[in-house]
């Protein structure tokens, strides 16, 4: 199937969709590759497994659905299994944008914007929160980590 749009989909400073490139296909097997320029700045690859009904970050005090942001990390998320429900917000943009990311589709505010494998990326200082429903999900985050990054205060 052709992608709905092979053009770059983004709101500058908030998010960008990076399309995987079809490499080859055999009976029952599809090979897709990451664009080379996308991989040049990767400094960490995080495997993230959400069990059923997981939320990240979790409840903090009386706040059921808190946000977090990374001042020294750019996130690049690809979902390998299940669905991730992701909310993004930046002060500059001024409103929440919601995404559903699956292994083969990305929805933005309820509209299908990518009908092939894609990576949802967001830069430092973007507030985000992630949820998986009952089936859970598995993803890889190809993180760009910058000077000042410390896992102790990154989350």
Residue ranges and their predicted role:
Residues 1-114, 134-155:
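Active-site region of the double-stranded beta-helix
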């Amino acid at each position: 199937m052709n992608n709905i749009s092979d053009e770059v989909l983004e709101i500058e400073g908030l998010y960008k969709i990076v399309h995987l490139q079809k490499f080859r296909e055999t009976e029952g097997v599809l090979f897709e590759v990451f664009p080379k320029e996308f991989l040049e700045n990767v400094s960490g690859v995080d495997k993230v497994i959400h069990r059923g009904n997981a939320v990240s970050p979790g409840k903090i005090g009386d706040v059921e659905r808190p946000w977090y942001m990374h001042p020294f990390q750019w996130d690049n998320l690809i979902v390998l299994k299940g669905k991730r429900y992701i909310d993004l917000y930046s002060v500059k943009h001024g409103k929440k944008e919601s995404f559903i990311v699956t292994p083969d589709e990305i929805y933005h505010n309820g509209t299908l914007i990518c009908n092939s494998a894609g990576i949802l990326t967001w830069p430092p200082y973007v507030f985000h929160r992630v949820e998986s429903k009952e089936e859970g999900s598995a993803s890889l985050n190809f993180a760009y980590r910058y000077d000042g990054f410390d896992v102790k205060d990154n989350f």
